[in-house]
Regions:
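A short, Lys/Arg-rich alpha-helix, primarily the initiator
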Residues: 1-16
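Alpha-helical residues within the helix-turn-helix
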Residues: 15, 26, 55
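Short alpha-helical DNA-recognition segment
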Residues: 18-37
């Protein structure tokens, strides 16, 4: 595990255990100034130091190293190309993934999923017409504590094409891909993301299943009673199950090489189902089933776009949070400082999004610290 920045959360949990800076300094064999710097976010803390504190003071390592903190080399891809014809005339002048879903651009939702998985190096695949708009919105990702790269998709030739276009970016790393119009909500999602990261590091691919009423329209996975994948099919006339394969995938290193071996389907595309089938045939495909308590939206139609916006609004108003907020996730992960969070909040302080960021920076006591960790979770 890499050294990490824990910052304010470290201080809040230390105080909740009634520990002084001197106590922690003595336990780690460092000077008090080192603890001051850790709490200011200007000094990283190593895994060995965290484990030592865990044993001495009964502090769960997960309190510091949650799924969102980057402790792996998995890279991420957001596929944000396509023409969005199902949303015409809305998308005749802009990318589908830049259309608002309640209070934020659609692409914030898949971006937040990757960030929640601890992925900091992300490639955004766009059309040539829309790339400038994405760069204007997201820039290089520094404001979220991440590194954003961009590549143009010359033509929409199938989802698996993303791994060929991103081959240089991916290199020898495992990789996750999420579709730019997919939204996920569920309190246990972070655990499923962590499992998928671990699977990828161990050489396994992971696909996410969700029960639907019209499986014949989608890619489908057939599973047994233990959620083992038995087969995958692309829009079958007679589906073997009603579990759709959603637009979130994790793959081990080498995925680009496998993608290049896929032959185009009858409709001339490099199907993601064909890629998944390659892993299945080698007993390297696992499933993550999103059951009760989860919601998945493919926001490619008028009705699904409205449904997603209404759901996000209801959740945010009832819980006084902002769902899929990249700034909050970055802050919780220790990727940006409190000062950077406040700066972002001040830029948008005239609306509820900016006010949320400012409120987030003001959480002080132990109970509020625990809320801080969960405010932007799914």
């Amino acid at each position: 595990m890499d050294d990490i920045i824990v910052g304010k959360l470290f201080k809040e949990i230390r105080e909740s255990k009634n520990l002084t800076q001197e106590d922690v300094a003595n336990a780690l064999g460092v000077g008090r100034n080192a603890i001051v710097r850790i709490e200011q976010g200007t000094r990283k803390i190593s895994a060995d130091e965290l484990i030592r504190l865990e044993k001495l003071y009964n502090i769960e390592l997960h309190s510091f190293v949650n799924v969102g903190i980057s402790n792996h080399n998995v890279k991420g891809i957001i596929l944000a190309g396509g023409t969005g014809t199902r949303l015409y005339p809305i998308t005749e002048g802009t990318s589908k993934q830049l259309v608002p879903v309640y209070d934020k651009p659609m692409i914030y939702y898949p971006l937040s999923v990757l960030m929640q998985a601890g992925i900091k190096d992300i490639l955004i695949i766009t059309t040539s017409e829309d790339q400038a708009s994405f760069k204007r919105l997201l820039k290089d990702g520094k404001q979220f504590g991440i590194n954003l790269n961009y590549v143009i998709q010359p033509s929409p030739d199938g989802l698996a094409q993303a791994f060929i276009l991103g081959e240089k970016f991916i290199g020898d790393s495992p990789c996750a891909m999420i579709l730019g119009d997919n939204i996920y909500y569920g309190n246990g999602l972070e655990k499923e993301l962590q499992k998928s990261i671990e699977n990828a590091l161990d050489g396994y691919a992971t696909i996410f299943g969700y029960k639907v009423k019209d499986p014949e329209r989608l890619g489908i996975m057939e599973i047994d009673d233990f959620n083992n994948v038995l087969s995958v099919e692309e829009k079958p006339k007679f589906p073997k199950s009603d579990y759709a394969i959603t637009g979130l995938y994790f793959y081990p290193k080498g995925v680009s090489e496998i993608a290049k071996t896929i032959k185009p389907s009858a409709r001339g595309e490099l199907e993601i189902t064909s890629l998944n089938d390659c892993y299945l045939k080698n007993n390297k495909l696992k499933s993550s089933i999103l059951g009760e308590g989860y919601t998945w939206f493919d926001t490619g139609t008028f009705s699904s776009l409205l449904d997603a916006s209404n759901m996000i609004r209801t959740i945010e108003e009832n819980k006084n949070i902002v769902v899929c907020c990249p700034e909050a996730i970055a802050y919780n992960n220790g990727w940006i400082s409190e000062e950077e969070l406040i700066e972002a909040g001040n830029l948008m302080k005239k609306n509820s999004y900016g006010q949320y960021l400012l409120e987030l920076s003001q959480k002080k006591n132990e109970n509020e610290a625990q809320k801080v960790k969960k405010l932007s979770l799914f």
